[in-house]
């Protein structure tokens, strides 16, 4: 990187990027089959781009990714992943090299996660009894029910499990699509609103769910696999 910093920025006309996991194998095979987006591997891509940005370079960034999964994947999803990775990469660069010329969106900083607040299962009334029995065997106790919905709260120390047997809404739709499964995960963060805003600017789909009397409005995004990821 220090050598790159000595190059005049106007002498660099194009930058191609790729990341990859560190795997001990033939270099050519590794390069052709295991590349991934910046930030998804083990290579010092941030350090490399910090050096490039420090030269005053303000030209295009290109992704050159050879990967067996990408070849058979959805072009739209791959393009979104690539866009997200570039925005995230350059946000990291800007925070370490503030005097750069590359145009970068001003997004909130990375969130600090303090833990999992709860995990919510969607299931039917019949299957809920079996799940509750399993939780009881594992040492969980029934801590209460939702004020207006068919949701039971099970707890063991700081671990919170919710069993949702609603017959409408997102949880029920998830049950119809996947059967008994995790539909919702909530994480404790420093600032839920800014966490969701960062996710939105990185391409995540924000989700607003209807709330009734006495219910909290918890910021959320659509997670991997279509589930809900909430922030508290």
Predicted regions and their residues:
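Acidic/histidine-rich catalytic cores of soluble enzymes
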Residues: 1-42
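Short, structured motif recognition centered on aromatic/hydrophobic residues
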Residues: 113-121, 135, 140, 154, ...
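Conserved, mostly hydrophobic/aromatic
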Residues: 15-17, 38, 52, 61, ...
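Vicinal oxygen chelate
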Residues: 37, 96-100, 105-109, 114-125, 153-165, 172-232
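C-terminal helical cap(s) of enzyme catalytic domains, especially alpha/beta-barrels
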Residues: 72-95
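Amphipathic alpha-helical segments
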Residues: 125-141, 198-202
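Structural preference for beta-strand elements that scaffold enzyme active sites
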Residues: 11-16, 58-62, 118, 160
């Amino acid at each position: 990187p220090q050598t790159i910093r000595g190059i005049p920025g106007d002498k660099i006309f194009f930058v191609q990027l790729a990341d990859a996991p560190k795997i001990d194998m033939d270099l050519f095979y590794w390069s052709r089959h295991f590349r991934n987006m910046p930030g998804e591997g083990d290579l010092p891509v941030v350090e490399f781009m910090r050096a490039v940005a420090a030269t005053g370079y303000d030209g295009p960034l290109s992704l050159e990714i050879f990967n067996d999964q990408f070849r058979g994947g959805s072009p739209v999803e791959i393009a979104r992943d690539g866009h997200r990775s570039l925005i995230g990469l350059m946000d990291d660069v800007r925070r370490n090299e503030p005097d750069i010329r590359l145009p970068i969106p001003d997004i909130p900083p990375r969130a600090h996660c303090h833990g999992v607040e709860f995990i919510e299962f969607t299931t039917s009334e019949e299957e809920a009894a079996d799940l509750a029995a399993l939780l009881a065997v594992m040492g969980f106790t029934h801590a209460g029910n939702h004020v207006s919905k068919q949701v039971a709260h099970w707890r063991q120390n700081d671990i919170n499990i919710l069993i949702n047997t609603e017959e409408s809404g997102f949880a029920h739709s998830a049950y119809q699509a996947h059967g008994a499964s995790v539909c919702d995960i909530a994480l404790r963060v420093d600032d839920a609103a800014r966490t969701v805003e960062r996710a939105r600017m990185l391409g995540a789909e924000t989700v607003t769910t209807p709330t009734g009397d006495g219910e909290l409005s918890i910021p959320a995004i659509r997670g991997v696999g279509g589930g809900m990821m909430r922030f508290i």
